[in-house]
Amino acid sequence: MLERYANEEMKALWNEQTKFETYLEVEKAVVRAWNKLGQIQDSDCEKICSKAAFNLECIKEIEKTTKHDLIAFTTCVAESLGEESRFFHYGITSSDCIDTAMALLMTKSLKLIQKGVKNLYETLKNRALEHKETLMVGRSHGVFGEPITFGLVLALFADEIKRHLKALDLTMEFISVGAISGAMGNFAHAPLELEELACEFLGLKTANINNQVIQRDRYARLACDLALLASSCEKIAVNIRHLQRSEVYEVEEAFSTGQKGSSAMPHKRNPILSENITGLCRVIRSFTTPMLENVALWHERDMSHSSVERFALPDLFITSDFMLSRLNSVIENLVVYPKNMLKNLALSGGLVFSQRVLLELPKKGLSREESYSIVQENAMKIWEVLQQGAFKNADENLFLNALLNDERLKKYLSEDEIKACFDYSYYTKNVGAIFKRVFE
């Protein structure tokens, strides 16, 4: 975890102090459960729950000998107690405490992620509504296609982010489970009721069955969902970067007073935040392979997953949280240039209307093949003109002029019918209906 890419609230969940505090919370829940089952006296339960304490230096010192951080933890806590310490960590195994504590930490962390996703969705929605009718050129393969609106671009992003909210709700169900089932998961030394009570105290569900650990397909699902979320965020960031290129310049990240873009070139205004998000997404996705490989543990459990999770889980949550907040800020403060969008539309010389013309000709009795041939032939002529450099008059509709002078077209379409094909409103007539689908 790098301080540079961490928000305080999420970072506070992933440190040694919080980890052991959560261990203690789990151990106290187990003590309370034993007490409710009549196996620990009220006085011992009260002493443990009120007096049990630890300090990190003590744990570190003990771990030098034990080479086992959970045993170092329980030993340290026992030193803060009296005879009642015999009931601390009673009847359970290390993974019962560690995995159940991890469930608590992941649940809290995922709630922060869900909050970040909701914020991003709302920001995308608001900006989409703001630019619902803002005309721009749609691009496929990076090449001009047909007129669309910037609002549609943002609405598409919003709808994708909304799908992640649904996926994360399901993932929350998978990860918010505890396990107090003993060394082999067969409840040999503690009844099922102990697990049920302890998890109830902690606000967790119980798994139907465990071995020594909570099964790692649950963790892998989380990692994959965060990787998918990152890919969607990268998709948004990459498109912003493309639209901010100098020759496009339809949107721009906010550039603050005093900000610098280059140590060598004073004129530079770069999409550095979107570039940063792109890089963070690569980091997030990089954890999916080791987390998937953690699923296949030996028999009832081995330790190969532990080192992976010590890296992966904190970094997955902290980086995802930061990525979401940064992207939300980029979208919220994004500067949009509608005039440049219209200018770029005009740069096609009218070619963006080719399909509209193509679809009118078959209505007049011409075959699709003949229609396509005529329209494409005229379009290719315009490409040749555009290849020679920018035309003198940006408002000049080269494609329209070519069509109006084509004798073959005149047999099927009048001048007014041809001109009617060059109408931007034709391409925006369904925007309202699309928005209704997305946002209502």
Residue ranges and their predicted role:
Residues 164, 212-305:
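Glycine-rich anion/phosphate-binding loop at the beta-strand->alpha-helix junction
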Residues 30-33, 113, 117-120, 124-127, ...:
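Amphipathic alpha-helices that form helix-helix packing interfaces
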Residues 195-212, 216:
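Active-site-adjacent "gating/activation" loops or surface patches in catalytic cores
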